[in-house]
């Protein structure tokens, strides 16, 4: 493999992705390096290349590819959910479930690791606490796509178990890993992106104060952006809460980090 491929910046448009790069991506030999490449993955080709090596039967592979063809909207996220759902359905009662999960979560392809998040999150026999623990390596993944899919995969469970989730994630705000800390706010955003809303937090954002307070002056811009976006979400239904909190933070935490978060948090309110 050409070493330059591993250090590429990535094309801006899908049609500009080099043929060799796209081939290697679809074979599962390399990771995507940007959103353009991530969206360009042909999941039918990818699973056809990788799954036989994992011991997934030809019958199950055909079921998945058939399901992908029947999608009304063949987006990357829908494809990931689709592949994971069929895999889970076929393996949920199998003694090979855990073995396959480990293979998925440790694969070099970021798209394959994305499958692992839903493959585990869909398992109703695993407690939410154990889901958090088992998915922690993917929540902390070095790849942006895996991290995003991880919180989306757990979003419903978090919404259904909000009190527990907030208590658990409050502890994670102490993590040395910025990706873990960012997950605490990104996964609980009242509105979020590409996901269902958490109505209880839209109406009662104060429920998540234990998380927000811990991160109000976080050193990571990645975390700061998420905290600011969380509060901007909340400002659309509870501007009073966000305004009062930001006023207090400006007095209590006179740091550049907090000032940056406050500016992001108030952007909708200040637009009037």
Predicted feature residues:
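Surface-facing alpha-helical segments and adjacent helix-coil boundary elements at the starts of domains
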Residues: 1-272
């Amino acid at each position: 493999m050409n070493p330059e491929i591993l250090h590429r910046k990535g094309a801006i448009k899908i049609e500009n992705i080099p043929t060799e790069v796209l081939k290697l991506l679809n074979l599962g030999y390399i990771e995507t390096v940007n959103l353009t490449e991530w969206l360009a993955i042909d999941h039918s080709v990818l699973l056809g290349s990788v799954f036989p090596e994992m011991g997934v039967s030809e019958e199950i592979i055909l079921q998945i590819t058939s399901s992908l063809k029947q999608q009304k909207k063949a987006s990357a996220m829908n494809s990931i959910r689709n592949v994971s759902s069929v895999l889970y359905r076929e393996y949920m009662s199998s003694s090979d479930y855990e073995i396959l999960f480990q293979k998925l979560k440790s694969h070099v392809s970021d798209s394959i690791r994305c499958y692992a998040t839903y493959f585990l999150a869909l398992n109703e026999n695993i407690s939410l606490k154990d889901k958090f623990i088992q998915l922690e390596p993917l929540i902390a993944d070095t790849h942006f796509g895996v991290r995003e899919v991880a919180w989306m995969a757990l979003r419903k469970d978090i919404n259904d178990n909000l009190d527990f989730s907030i208590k658990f994630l409050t502890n994670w705000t102490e993590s040395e890993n910025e990706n873990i800390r960012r997950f605490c706010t990104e996964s609980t955003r009242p509105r979020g992106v590409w996901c269902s809303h958490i109505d209880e937090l839209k109406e009662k954002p104060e429920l998540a104060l234990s998380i927000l307070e811990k991160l109000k002056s976080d050193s990571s811009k990645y975390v700061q952006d998420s905290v600011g976006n969380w509060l901007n979400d909340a400002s659309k239904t509870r501007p009073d809460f966000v305004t009062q909190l930001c006023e207090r933070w400006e007095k209590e935490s006179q740091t550049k980090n907090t000032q940056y978060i406050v500016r992001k948090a108030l952007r909708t309110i200040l637009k009037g």
